[in-house]
Amino acid sequence: MATPIKVGIVGYGFSTKCFHLPFILPNPELHVHAFLQRAPAPDPASPSDAPGWGHCTVDFPGAKHYRTPEEFFSDGEIELVVVCTPSHEEFVERALEAGKHVVVEKPFVNTSAAADRLIALAKEKGKVLTVFHNRRFDSDFRTLEHLVNSGALGDIRDAQLHFDFPSPSWVSGWTRKEYQPGEGMAFGLGTHTVDQALRLFGTPASVTGFLRSNRGVDSDVDDTFTIVMQYAGEKRNLLVTVKTAIVTPLQDQLKFFVRGTGGSYVKFGSCPQEARAIASPGQPATDPDFGAEDPRIWGTLSTTGEFDAASQTLDAASGLHVGKYPSLPGWYRGYYENVADAVRGRAEVCVRAETARDGLRVIELARESHVRGCTMPWS
C-alpha cells in the first residue's frame, strides 16, 4: 500500500474528537501526524490536568504537538490539514500558502467573498480544498438522494428539508442584539441542509428568507429560519424549502417531505451516526451497525407505480404503492475515503468548495431578503 497521507489537525476540541477523528482513524490511507493546540501539554504525571476536551499529547502521544501556527504550517511532512477551530479563514489560507490540501469544518467561512478568494488560492496552488459537509452521508439523505436520482418520485415539484432541533442548549449564549456575518442558525445547522438542497437540485434562480429569534431575547441573530429556493427553466415548477425550528415538540423531528409527479417521501427521525459518535463511551465507527437506522423511523414512500415490492403494498383507496422504505446506512467514513482519493488524484472531491460557497451565498441572500422584505434573485 502507498504511504499514508500525513494529516495535521488544527484544534483539539469537540469537533475534532467527535466528528473527525472517529472517521479519520479507521482509514489506512490517513495517518494522524500532528496537532495545532495552543494549550501546553499537561505534566505526564497528571494527565487529568489537561484542559477542556483534553490534550492531544495525552490521547495521541505519538503525534507531534505544535503550539503556534508558524511551527505547525512549517512541518513539511503534513500533506492534509483539517481545520476544526471556530474561525477558519486564516488557517485555511495559511495551509494553502504552505502547500497543503485542506478540509475545513462548516461553515466554510463567514462570507461568500472570502470563499471565492480561498477557492482561487487553492486553484493557484493546485491543492484540494473541501468543506466538511458530512450530512451528505447521513442515512436519511443518502436514501432521499437515491430515491430522487432513481426516478422513484418522478419530477420533483416540492421539497422540504428540515434540521429542526428542540430548544438547543447552545443558543442560550446568543445574547447580542447585532448580527455579524457567520452567526446564527442558518450559518450553523442551515449550512448542512442548504448543501443537501444544492446537491439535489443545484443553484436556485431566487431566494426568499424568513429569520426569527425564538429563544426569548431580542436579537438579529437567528435561531429559527425558513429559506425558500425557486428555480427556473426545466425546474421552474420546483419549490425547495430549507428550515430549522427550535420550537418543535415532536417525538421524532421531521427531516424530509418531498413530492413529485411519481410519488412522495416523508421522513421523520435522524441519522444515528452523530449520536453514536458523541456518546460516552462512543460507538466505534467501524461497528457494522454504526450507521444503521432503527426501522421504526424509516421513511414512508408512496409511489404511483410499484418501486420496491419488498417494502410497498398497493393501497386500494389511493391507488398508491405505500410502505416504509428501508433507509440506506449512514456512512460518514465515506467523506474521508473520498478526501483520500482526491488527494491521491484518484477521484474528484465530493464536496466541492464551490458548492459550499454557493451555500453561503444562499444564506446571505436569505438574510438580505429578510431585511429588505422581498425575494432576491440569485447573484
Where are these regions (language model features)?
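Active-site loop of classical SDR/Rossmann-like NAD(P)-dependent oxidoreductases
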Residues: 15, 45-48, 252, 323-336
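Short acidic low-complexity segments
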Residues: 63-75
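Contiguous beta-strand/loop segments that form the cofactor/metal-binding neighborhood of enzyme cores
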Residues: 188, 194-286, 333-347, 364-365, ...
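Predominantly a Rossmann-like dinucleotide-binding segment in NAD(P)-dependent oxidoreductases
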Residues: 135-219, 373
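A short helix->loop->beta-strand "cap" motif at the edges of active sites that frequently abuts
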Residues: 62-63, 98-100, 125-127, 234-238
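C-terminal helix-rich "cap/oligomerization" subdomain common to oxidoreductases
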Residues: 4, 29, 36, 80-82, ...
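N-terminal Rossmann-like dinucleotide-binding module
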Residues: 1-60
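Beta-strand-loop-alpha-helix segment that lines the small-molecule cofactor/substrate pocket
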Residues: 79-80, 86-136, 151
